């Protein structure tokens, strides 16, 4: 979910 920097699952 971040700006391509860190992958965080937006659930």
Curated annotation (Swiss-Prot):
InterPro entries: Periviscerokinin. Its main location: secreted. The keyword Plastid does not apply. Pfam families: Periviscerokin. GO terms for biological process: neuropeptide signaling pathway. GO terms for cellular component: extracellular region. It comes from the Eukaryota. Keywords: Amidation, Neuropeptide, Secreted. Abdominal perisympathetic organs. It is found in: Secreted. The modification Valine amide is found at residue 11. Belongs to the periviscerokinin family. Mediates visceral muscle contractile activity (myotropic activity). This is Periviscerokinin-2 type 2. The lineage of its organism: Eukaryota, Metazoa, Ecdysozoa, Arthropoda, Hexapoda.
């Amino acid at each position: 979910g971040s700006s391509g920097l860190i992958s965080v699952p937006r659930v």
